[in-house]
Amino acid sequence: MDRGCGTTPIYKGGTLPEWATINAPSFLPYVIATPEIAMGYLFTYPLAAGLNANTKILWYVATPRGGYALEAVGHPLGAKSPTASFSKAADSGPGEIYPTGPTVPSAGCWHFILVWQNGAQHADVDLLFKS
C-alpha cells in the first residue's frame, strides 16, 4: 500500500499471521514489527504528529502478555531526541492485544521499541507521522 518509513512498510490486505486475526479489523492498513512477533492495525491513517493528535493503533502480539503492559519508547529515526513513549496495560481482549494512542511531538519517521512480558519480548517498528 505505502512504503511507510525506515524498515517498516505499511500493508493493506494480504495474508496475516494467525495470531493477529482474532476479531481483527483486517480491512485497515497495518504494520509488522521486526521480528515478526507484533503488528499494529492503523485505525488512524496517516498517523498525525503533535501532542494533541488523535491516533489509534491496535497492537497484536504473538506471545501471551502474561498480564504485563506493552511499553514503547521511540525517537526520530537517525536521532536520539526528542523522545516519545506510550504504555498500555494488558486489560483488553479478546486475544493478545493492546489498543494505544501514540503521540509524537514532531512529524517524521519515528523508531519505536515495543516491549511486553515484563521485558521478555521486544520488537522494533518504524512509524511515519505527518503534520
Write out the residue ranges for each language-model feature.
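Contiguous segments within soluble domain cores/interaction surfaces
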Residues: 1-105, 109-131
